Amino acid sequence: MSTQYSILFKQEHAHEDAIWTAAWGRSEKDGSETIVTGSLDDLVKVWKWSDEKLELQWTLEGHQLGVVSVNISQNGAIAASSSLDAHIRLWDLETGKQIKSMDAGPVDAWTVAFSPDSKYIATGSHLGKVNIFGVESGKKEHSLDTRGKFILSIAYSPDGKYLASGAIDGIINIFDIATGKLLHTLEGHAMPIRSLTFSPDSQLLVTASDDGYIKIYDVQHANLAGTLSGHGSWVLSVAFSPDDTHFVSSSSDKSIKVWDTSSRSCVNTFFDHQDQVWSVKYNPTGSKIVSAGDDRAIHIYDCPM
């Protein structure tokens, strides 16, 4: 158990080009931990995390253009990736084989997110729609219409009740998943929403924007509960720790910040990347953070528990 924040491991030259996305999952089967990364080099890579180091397990080929988003199912068995080639691909993490490819066209799928029960994958489109695909069927099963602009980011609430989307014009929409109804439209940002994340108890929504701010919303009442500044540029990624106590952000200012949820204060800043940091996530226990970005490196940090 670590008592302070520190960098634990660096994987330099992890990809041939910028890394835009990373996910950290744990297999329900054997407890093994996997990190999946996606890059502008068109590749998805699967890394095993054990003995405090990363080992490349699979290099997954299939996308024709850069990979913009990856996500891992709740049971740690499947990864989803989306690419500028407008396809979503599902991969078996045990064998490294492609399970299926879904055409998310006509132009693009940006963020991909598994539903909490891992039966569905949601993705945002340039037309302001959230398209929801069945993992089993591989077909589009529902669509939620924001009547807005290109959706860059989406997140499911862990309790399965809500889906939030963030658009290129800074507008955030929260939907009731059961009814498909639009519940709230949040207009706190004026620039693209790169990332959003619900707290583990589904009470808070944290948003990251090119305006340099992180905002915290009370989901039920759609109230703005906090505005955090500290990054010197675009905020590209936000993620909650599994125990609700902290969340982490990354920015094009090359830094990663860890925030205390209750005090809304920054408790640690990492300046280890050489370029903008596109993706940051906690591991399933909240003891580690993974980050990746334009410098093609994957970093693992230790968090005090």
From Swiss-Prot:
The domain of life for this entry's organism is Eukaryota
GO BP, one example?
Answer: nuclear-transcribed mRNA catabolic process, 3'-5' exonucleolytic nonsense-mediated decay
Sorted keywords for this record are: Cytoplasm, Nucleus, Repeat, WD repeat
Pfam families per UniProt: WD40 (PF00400)
Q: State where the protein is found.
A: Nucleus; Cytoplasm
Which InterPro entries does the entry link to? G-protein_beta_WD-40_rep, SKI8, WD40/YVTN_repeat-like_dom_sf, WD40_repeat_CS, WD40_repeat_dom_sf, WD40_rpt
- Check the record and name the Gene3D superfamilies matching this protein: YVTN repeat-like/Quinoprotein amine dehydrogenase (2.130.10.10)
Question: Is Cytoplasm one of the keywords UniProt gives this record?
Answer: yes
Q: Give the principal location in a single coarse category.
A: nucleus
The UniProt entry's coiled-coil ranges are none
- Assembly and interactions? Component of the PAF1 complex. Component of the SKI complex.
PANTHER family per record: SUPERKILLER COMPLEX PROTEIN 8, WD REPEAT-CONTAINING PROTEIN 61
Q: What does this protein do?
A: Component of the PAF1 complex (PAF1C) which has multiple functions during transcription by RNA polymerase II and is implicated in regulation of development and maintenance of embryonic stem cell pluripotency. PAF1C associates with RNA polymerase II through interaction with POLR2A CTD non-phosphorylated and 'Ser-2'- and 'Ser-5'-phosphorylated forms and is involved in transcriptional elongation, acting both independently and synergistically with TCEA1 and in cooperation with the DSIF complex and HTATSF1.
What name appears for this protein in its UniProt entry? Answer: Superkiller complex protein 8
Write down the species.
Danio rerio (Zebrafish)
Q: Which gene encodes it?
A: skic8
